[in-house]
């Protein structure tokens, strides 16, 4: 039996990243104008995915819920998460997905997201081994970090509307830090 087909699914939502070293895990997400970067170190057997809404911030938030929307923050978190799990920066390889223009009358944030991801990876010296960005439809993405295999499905109709709604929904806010400790 193909272990990739039977893998345990872990969904990555907007504003999140996941790093795994379990060969039975399949990371999945649904993308409209958002972009997901999938990275791995094939020698270390570790990989992960992020899912960001916007490329970067002029104010570069360092903490709080706002930071999780931005690619600049989530790309750093993903890379650092991989390094903490034994990956080496010089062996990292990446695939990028998403960046669709889901509504013609809106600015093309999807194209900006994809361009940001490409430039960020190039600046960091991380090889891009695959890319599927742009277009007019959202995507459902599955990524097997252990092998680097990725599979996507074009979303149409109801699925596309759901992806669009997810892209327009704000990222889940993180709880505010407080000096109060509860027991």
From Swiss-Prot:
GO terms for biological process: chemotaxis. One of its GO terms (molecular function) is protein-glutamine glutaminase activity. It catalyses: L-glutaminyl-[protein] + H2O = L-glutamyl-[protein] + NH4(+). It comes from the Bacteria. CDD domains: CheD (cd16352). Pfam families: CheD (PF03975). InterPro entries: CheD-like_sf (IPR038592), Chemorcpt_Glu_NH3ase_CheD (IPR005659), Cytotoxic_necrot_fac-like_cat (IPR011324). The keyword Hydrolase applies. Belongs to the CheD family. Probably deamidates glutamine residues to glutamate on methyl-accepting chemotaxis receptors (MCPs), playing an important role in chemotaxis. This is Probable chemoreceptor glutamine deamidase CheD.
């Amino acid at each position: 039996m193909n272990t990739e087909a039977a893998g345990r699914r872990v969904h990555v939502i907007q504003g999140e990243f996941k790093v795994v070293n379990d060969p039975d895990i399949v990371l999945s997400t649904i993308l409209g104008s958002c972009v997901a970067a999938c990275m791995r170190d094939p020698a270390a057997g570790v990989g992960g995915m992020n899912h960001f809404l916007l490329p970067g911030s002029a104010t570069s938030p360092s903490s709080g819920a706002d930071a999780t929307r931005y690619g600049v923050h989530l790309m750093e978190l993903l890379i650092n998460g991989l390094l903490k799990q034994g990956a080496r920066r010089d062996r990292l390889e990446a695939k990028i997905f998403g960046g669709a223009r889901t509504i013609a009358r809106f600015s093309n944030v999807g194209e900006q997201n994809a361009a940001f991801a490409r430039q960020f990876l190039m600046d960091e010296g991380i090889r891009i081994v695959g890319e599927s960005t742009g277009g007019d439809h959202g995507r459902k993405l599955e990524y097997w970090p252990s092998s680097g295999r990725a599979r996507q499905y074009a979303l149409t109709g109801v699925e596309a509307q759901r992806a669009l709604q997810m892209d327009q929904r704000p990222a889940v806010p993180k709880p505010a830090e407080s000096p109060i400790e509860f027991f």
